[in-house]
Design a protein with these regions (language model features):
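S-adenosyl-L-methionine
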Residues: 2-81, 121-168
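Conserved class I S-adenosyl-L-methionine
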Residues: 80-93
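Conserved SAM-binding loop of SAM-dependent methyltransferases across substrates and taxa
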Residues: 92-106
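Short beta-strand element of Class I
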Residues: 107-112
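Conserved SAM/SAH-binding beta-strand->alpha-helix loop
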Residues: 114-118
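A short SAM/SAH-binding and catalytic strip from SAM-dependent methyltransferases
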Residues: 160-185
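C-terminal substrate-binding/active-site "lid" region of AdoMet-derived donor-dependent transferases
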Residues: 182-246
Length: 247
């Protein structure tokens, strides 16, 4: 992948720089965050890999959405220890990168996405954190095949070999893609997520596989035993619904 994505492509690279500038222009971070690292990470990624389109992951909507998510996670959890954070459908790792720029007490972040290209790009963008005892590590994994009680993990190493299997507890699970699959409510949330697990869930309106018409419908779909945040974000003609709490 490295050879393919590092091929010269001036038009794509210029487009990526424009996308990154739009993304950075719409970040609204709280005083507890520092976005200098995400600026450098995007700059280095675009310079090193000009032949990949990042527009699906780095855009105005994601910038505003991720800022909202992070601000409220910081507000809810402050300096409480969060342990291992699982980001489902994490794409190229932008949300994870922004979370690690905060003062949240995160042990490490696992960026899960079924798209293998995302794993490569995420690990490249976060290479310093990958080398830091896997403070960040992307994996190609189906969210329906994760054990959310205690997950047993094998990851592909840089030399193409597979690591020894190890176990970890996903203490905080972030899913910003509740509207992107039709079977999330019952097959995933109800059946797979253990009680007392910390959750951050986001659904949305619009042209997605499972659109939620309003906040009330989204709330009913994902009941929690202890709700710590419930809110709505409007970006252009789309609304996002978010719940933070304990299942």
């Amino acid at each position: 992948m490295a050879n393919q994505y590092s091929e010269k492509n001036n038009a794509q690279q210029l487009g990526n720089y424009r996308q990154a500038m739009e993304f950075l222009a719409h970040i609204t971070l709280s005083k507890n965050t520092d976005n200098d690292k995400i600026v450098d990470k995007l700059k280095d990624l675009i310079y090193s890999y000009p032949n990949i389109d990042i527009s699906s992951f780095v855009n105005k909507h994601h910038s505003i959405l991720y800022s909202w998510i992070i601000q409220n996670i910081v507000r809810v959890y402050g300096q409480k220890y969060l342990g291992t954070v699982y980001i489902l459908g994490g794409g190229i790792g932008v949300l994870g990168a922004m979370l690690l720029d905060t003062k949240l007490r995160i042990e490490n972040i696992r960026n899960l996405d079924i798209n293998g290209t995302c794993k490569f790009i995420a690990d490249e963008m976060m290479k310093d954190e990958v080398l830091d005892n896997w403070k960040f590590k992307a994996t190609t994994q189906d969210l329906f095949k994760v054990n959310y009680q205690t997950n047993r993990v094998e990851v592909e190493l840089p030399d193409g070999t597979i690591s020894k299997e190890f176990s970890e507890v996903p203490a905080l699970v972030i899913n910003t893609n509740c509207s992107h699959l039709n079977n999330m409510e019952n097959d995933w949330y109800e059946k797979m997520i253990p009680k007392t697990r910390k959750m951050v869930l986001v659904g949305e309106t619009g042209n997605v596989p499972h659109s939620y018409p309003n906040q009330k419908t989204f709330n009913a779909a994902y009941p929690m035993s202890f709700e710590q945040y419930n809110g709505v974000l409007t970006v252009d003609d789309k609304q996002y619904f978010m719940k933070i709490g304990i299942k």
